[in-house]
């Protein structure tokens, strides 16, 4: 059961060489950089813990979800795919996570693709919402399209062809 710090930084360290310092021919873990980044992610995503050395498995499900998000964000992807990013997270933290994802898109140009069963959450942050019905893309709607359009699309009764936003 690895610490919160290791859960957040390990993938980026292994795949991108982040948090490593070169000493001669060796590359060693830069503990100060890793610790600083992990602490920043804990603060940014409001991960409720006793500290970054706490085992991630000891956290609540919602806080474990935020650690997973922190790990993905540490990789600094151009495109971030997240599935149910607010599942198990308390209401206040849901807003924080969604606003942070929107901020990454707005300020860093990161494309964020969210798969979610929470339509109201999607409508609060997305600029386009693709509706999948019977395994096919039924339509693409704008967040401010009518509830009736969303209802028809989600029920599989959409007859208007693709409504691309």
Q: Predicted segment positions?
A:
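ABC-family nucleotide-binding domains
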Residues: 83, 90
């Amino acid at each position: 059961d690895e610490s919160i710090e290791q859960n957040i930084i390990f993938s980026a360290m292994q795949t991108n060489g982040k948090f490593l310092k070169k000493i001669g021919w060796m590359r060693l873990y830069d503990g100060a950089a890793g610790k600083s980044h992990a602490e920043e992610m804990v603060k940014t995503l409001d991960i409720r813990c006793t500290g970054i050395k706490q085992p991630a498995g000891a956290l609540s499900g919602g806080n474990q979800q935020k650690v997973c998000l922190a790990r993905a964000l540490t990789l600094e992807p151009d495109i971030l795919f997240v599935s149910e990013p607010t599942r198990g997270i308390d209401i206040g933290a849901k807003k924080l996570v969604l606003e942070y994802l929107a901020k990454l898109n707005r300020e860093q140009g990161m494309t964020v693709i969210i798969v979610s069963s929470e339509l109201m959450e999607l409508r609060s942050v997305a600029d386009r919402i693709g509706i999948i019905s019977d395994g096919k893309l039924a339509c693409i709607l704008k967040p401010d399209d009518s509830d009736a359009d969303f209802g028809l699309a989600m029920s599989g009764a959409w007859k208007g062809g693709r409504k691309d936003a």
